[in-house]
Amino acid sequence: FKVNQQIGGGTWVYLGTFTFDKGRNDYGMVVLSNESKEKGVVCADAVRFGGGMGNIARGGQTSGLPRYLEGARYSAQWAGMPYSVYGGYEGKNDMNDDINVRSRTVNYLAGKSLFNPTEEGLGIPFEMSMALHSDAGFSKEDEIIGTLGIYTTNFNNGKLHAGTDRHASRDLSDILLTQLQRDIRSTFNVDWTRRSLWNRNYSETRLPAVPSTIVELLSHQNFADMRLGHDPNFKFTVGRALYKAILQYICSQHGKDYVVQPLPVSHFAIRFGQKKNTLELSWQGEEDPLEPTAKPREYIVYTRIGRGGFDNGVRVSSPSHTVKIEPGIVYSFKVTAVNRGGESFPSEILAAYKAKREKGQILIVNGFDRISGPAVIDTPDAAGFDLSQDPGVPYLYDISLCGAQQNFSRKEAGRRLGESSDEYEGMKIIGNTFDYPFVHGKAIQAAGNYSFVSCSDEAVEKGILSLEDYPIVDYILGLEKEDNSSNPARNTYYKTFSSPMQRILTSYCQSGGHLLVSGAYVGSDMDSSQGNKEFIQNILKYRHGNSLKTDGDKIAVRGLGHTFTLPRLPNEQSYPVTSPDCILPMSPAFPVMTYAIGNTPAAVAYQGNDYRTFVMGFPFESIREETSRNAIMASILRFLTTDYTD
């Protein structure tokens, strides 16, 4: 890391997120070293791990929430800002201080820099300020409210602190709204509304020393807006649009061309290499149809050994990489694309393992790509989001959920419609971590003497890997399902078994393969057409019974000599399985697991002379206890491989 110690003193400098072993140990430390070819010393007043819990007391009590969920006024105090920045109302009106402290913090951090030369401060060259808000307002006709931009010109004789005309704030606001509307309309094929540009007197656009704007992205009070707003795909599009707009603005101020960071790579796959104890990684760079400059030029491959953290990565010029490995250790990999503009979001995480005494190879296919908002209620009388049916799938995690919606009455629009409880406040709710080949792989490792590699389902569908090369295939489906109701404008396809995958799995089974499938919607997602039903009934040997409905925070499952549980409610350890599928065997298949409630089949096995299948109506990785996962995987592998003819 490069840290300029001549600016920004007296406050925290974020270095990154790192993995440490739990508890106290000899390696749980940060070492400060002065070893360098250059003159000078490295110094730090303090090192902080994590953001911590709120500790600014009011009325003798703290909030009890993580600091990142508290207001800006408390954050600024803990970050080392002077009292004049955060205490204008002397502790008597935290709300007003919270509004003003955002701008005053920017001014203090940028003080004595080129962009705020007239104020004292830390010299950090902030060039602009953007406040991202949601707005009020509602439509009883389910029309989108859309985005509003706000700026202020009538202050300080129309000048900013560096002498720049305050109309620069209008330019910034215009660029942001234009990019947002263009990208949302193009990505989701929805008529997203650009409301207007307001030249008004707001603290966050009046006080900053630099060009500033408020972006009122959408209405949190309006069902049509929030139907999009809850979708992580929408959040990514919005975030990328704002980033691109800010980049355009700053580069235009300096007369420079801009380059946008690439999109994440796709079609990621791992094979065993031609040389002994090697792995061959391959992937595909993605073009951005909305941004011609976002072309990948190079890639960074990150490696994780066992349960450790990822390394700093290896830069490669082509979409492939060969890695030497040591038998007996599980390796995990993720890939990013890079160009002059920066680094993309990471790929899904794939894992591989070479057994010391190999008796077979397994291919793990990751088909769990879904990220989604919660289930939707949309009737003439009711509107909202039903967390009890499906709380959605956050990208990695979600910190914004307060609780389940309580009021669904459309008659209450603009008043109590959308009112929620607070049981999830302060929770970091786990979503799709894109790291489940590792969970499956560790269970395979524990079963003994099986090697494995993994790949994305896109790589299989494109023919990059052939299932027939592997005697056993483990197909991860997690919470994958086709879901148009939560966001009807979504253009992403999350089918459990796509048409190409159905053909590939049919061919694999008919060639004598051994297939493990697990997912919460392997039955219900295949009820939409006769062709889908025939595939699961004739090839995978099961049919959909119903979706399990139950109360409580966990679901008990029995089978293969074990009883284990699945999480049913949002939590901080693993994604919830709200209503897994009950699947019924098609003769001569038979049930091998049951849900404790109702004693309905949870898993079905088929042992034919031609091929074998083991299908679970819940995700394997959602089994809470690792010992249970290991035991269940060992039993499944025995079933798939044992010769029962003797």
Predicted features along the sequence, with ranges:
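Active-site microenvironments of hydrolase-like enzyme catalytic domains
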Residues: G71-R170, W198-Q221
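Short alpha-beta junction capping motif
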Residues: R357-F368, A375-L387, G463-S529, Q607, ...
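A glycine-rich, often tryptophan-bearing local segment used as a flexible ligand/cofactor-contacting loop or short
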Residues: L479-M593, I597, I632
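Aromatic-Pro/Gly-enriched surface loop or interdomain linker
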Residues: G59, E348-I472, I476-L479, A634-Y644
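Short beta-strand-plus-loop segments that form exposed binding edges in beta-rich domains
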Residues: V30-G40
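Pro/Thr/Ser/Gly-rich low-complexity, intrinsically disordered linker/stalk tracts
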Residues: Y249-T293, P327, G342-G360
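A glycine-centered loop/beta-turn motif at secondary-structure junctions
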Residues: L207-H220, A241, Y470, Q510-S518, ...
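Active-site-adjacent mobile loop/cap segments within catalytic or ligand-binding domains
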Residues: S33-E35, A46-G54, S113, A131-G158, ...
